[in-house]
């Protein structure tokens, strides 16, 4: 149970009381976890008495685990009960003891006051792209291209051929690897150098000065040998082609493909309308944003960047030093701050919209979305809450409110009422888990074929740099 102690301007203090029964339940959960994880000589796993385990890990450790578990659950719950959303907070917990209620106080700063401009008369003009017969035929043509086969050709290279080349070293030794290049997708300098050549020819490809990633490349020459020339063979658009993509017939392929294109077009239209409304809200709102809010968002974005680099085997200090050498560090930091402020403005506008429209997500809905999110990430709810932390759980709850408010506003502008709101939390939970709705398996197969072709082409061009 949360109780507001004081609220002056955007400064707030409140107290949360946790009943003794829930404290005991948290103790039981912690003891169960310790009994499972702590190995005590002379006892089978899970059979050691609590006193023995306590002597092994320390009473203070047990209490800290219980306290953290209670804070993880009841801090965010207290914020929801009081309708608070804090920029920053200091939590002061009392000692925790089995069989006794637990209390903690929170002092923090609420989000700034936001006033939205008039949006209810907005005419959202963004429309879903029209799926015409021409669009369908072009998509079928693309599928045909992606599923093309290649046959060895004993003739000079033509514009649509696949050409296997071998990079040569000094003295024309076969120093580099061999790889295919799809001429109709190749860079102009590669295409022009190879057209008209035949298998066995040695070709000098002049690569113009360019930037690849973070590296500047001066103009240079790559010497290659044409290993093999293959001509493209396109299948006819008939039932046999449809069957190769796991469709019953060409008619079925056309029908399903049109439905998929229309679904994607509708999704694109929805996204365009959302962005149009959000842009209008941000442009018309009045707000003074605390620098701490921008700084916190910037820190979060920086952490994401560092995590991405780490996954690629690059340390942030190395990347920072490289940008410094290139004279790009100041620009990077300025862009990061600007993007952080843009995201904060967007979130504040959507949160105020949800407040103005009295959009709500009840406890049952929120718990269900947490369960969906946990399952999507292969964990239980408690593990998810521990991973997200107090602020993460609250941020997730606020993201659901933002989504619900946006859906309600869009429905109001389109005259559709609130019919789409019920699905909001579940859909948002799935997106937050990083799992988008899957495409039909048959269409996905064709897309995978395309991806393999593009990857091979990309690899070929990169090795020619």
Swiss-Prot record:
Record-listed E.C. numbers: 5.2.1.8
Compositionally biased residues, Polar residues: 435-465
Catalytic function, reaction form: [protein]-peptidylproline (omega=180) = [protein]-peptidylproline (omega=0)
Keyword set, alphabetical order: Cell cycle, Cell division, Chaperone, Cytoplasm, Isomerase, RNA-binding, Rotamase, rRNA-binding
HAMAP family: Trigger_factor_Tig (MF_00303)
NCBIfam families: tig (TIGR00115)
Protein name as it appears in the record: Trigger factor
Species of provenance: Deinococcus radiodurans (strain ATCC 13939 / DSM 20539 / JCM 16871 / CCUG 27074 / LMG 4051 / NBRC 15346 / NCIMB 9279 / VKM B-1422 / R1)
Gene giving rise to this polypeptide: tig
């Amino acid at each position: 149970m949360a109780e507001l102690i004081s609220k002056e301007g955007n400064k707030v203090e409140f107290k949360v009381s946790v009943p003794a029964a829930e404290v005991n339940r948290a103790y039981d959960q912690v003891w169960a976890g310790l009994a499972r994880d702590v190995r005590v000589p002379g006892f089978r796993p899970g059979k050691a008495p609590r006193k023995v385990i306590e002597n092994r890990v320390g009473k203070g450790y047990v209490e800290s685990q219980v306290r953290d578990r209670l804070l993880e659950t009841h801090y965010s719950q207290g914020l929801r009960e009081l309708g608070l959303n804090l920029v920053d907070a200091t939590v002061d917990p009392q000692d925790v003891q089995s069989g006794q209620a637990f209390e903690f106080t929170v002092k923090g700063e609420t989000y700034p006051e936001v006033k939205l401009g008039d949006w209810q008369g907005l005419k959202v003009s963004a429309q879903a792209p029209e799926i015409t017969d021409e669009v369908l035929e072009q998509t079928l043509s693309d599928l045909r291209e992606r599923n093309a086969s290649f046959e060895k050709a004993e003739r000079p290279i033509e514009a649509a051929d696949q050409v296997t080349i071998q990079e040569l070293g000094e003295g024309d030794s076969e120093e580099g690897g061999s790889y295919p290049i799809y001429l109709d997708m190749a860079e102009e300098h590669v295409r022009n150098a190879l057209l008209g050549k035949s298998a066995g020819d040695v070709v000098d490809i002049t690569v113009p000065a360019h930037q690849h990633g973070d590296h500047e490349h001066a103009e240079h020459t790559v010497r290659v040998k044409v290993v093999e020339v293959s001509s493209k063979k396109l299948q006819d658009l008939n039932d046999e082609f449809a069957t190769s993509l796991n469709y019953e017939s060409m008619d079925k392929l056309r029908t399903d493909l049109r439905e998929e294109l229309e679904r994607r077009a509708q999704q694109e239209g929805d996204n365009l309308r959302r962005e149009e409304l959000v842009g209008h809200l941000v442009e018309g709102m009045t707000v003074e944003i605390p620098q701490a809010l921008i700084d916190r968002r910037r820190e979060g974005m920086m952490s994401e960047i560092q995590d991405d680099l780490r996954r690629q085997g690059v340390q942030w200090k190395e990347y920072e030093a490289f940008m410094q050498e290139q004279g790009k560090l100041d620009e990077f930091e300025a862009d990061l701050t600007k993007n952080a402020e843009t995201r904060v403005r967007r979130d504040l506008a959507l949160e105020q919209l949800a407040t103005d429209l009295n959009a709500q997500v009840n406890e049952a809905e929120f718990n269900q979305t947490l369960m969906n999110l946990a399952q999507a990430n292969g964990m239980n709810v408690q593990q998810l809450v521990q991973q997200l932390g107090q602020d993460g759980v609250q941020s997730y709850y606020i993201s659901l409110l933002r989504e619900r408010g946006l859906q309600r506003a869009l429905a109001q502008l389109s005259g559709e009422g609130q019919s789409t709101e019920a699905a909001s939390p579940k859909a948002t939970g799935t997106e937050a888990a990083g799992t988008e709705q899957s495409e039909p398996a048959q269409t996905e197969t064709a897309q995978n074929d395309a991806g393999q072709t593009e990857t091979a082409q990309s690899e070929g061009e990169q090795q020619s740099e």
